[in-house]
């Protein structure tokens, strides 16, 4: 996708643009059906610039590219009526709480509005009642003090009740790769250990 120089500024800064010439994109649900305009689903693309597959790895290729040639990116995205796409998260990061799909990025962007929050990461942890619960790891701005009750109060009435983090932890930083990418799975695993949850419950 791309934005054009003559696209409105609000489009250029709030989306990843529209499909490029001679390529196709679609947003699909878990069953491969195209979702309605504005609804989140997996971002798929097809065309001359899309890879043919993984070198010498037919199994991985079959996971990424379906029989009709669509490459499944693993990105969660929406598309508006004018064809502008917006990436809203990663499928592997999505939390399913009590049958509701919860997108961590949405909660993270909301919590960034809190004046004391410098950075935040949202993950799902196993829960016997709801399947998964929301957990927030929060890094505060220098010199700030905050507690779980303040975060909950900030969320009340502003986001859906099932999106409010049940667990809130204040941290100095996040586990990262050598290239600086945050490793959410390590946050999740740390919470599983702390809460005494069984890994089998995450399946």
What does each of the following model-derived ranges do?
Residues 6-7, 150-157, 195-198:
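Short, positively charged
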Residues 189-203:
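Acidic/polar alpha-helix N-cap and adjacent early helical turns
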Residues 1-23, 37-41, 50-52, 62, ...:
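Conserved ATP-binding loop and adjacent catalytic segment of the adenylate-forming AMP-binding
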Residues 25, 31, 47-53, 60-63, ...:
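AMP-binding/adenylate-forming catalytic core of the ANL superfamily
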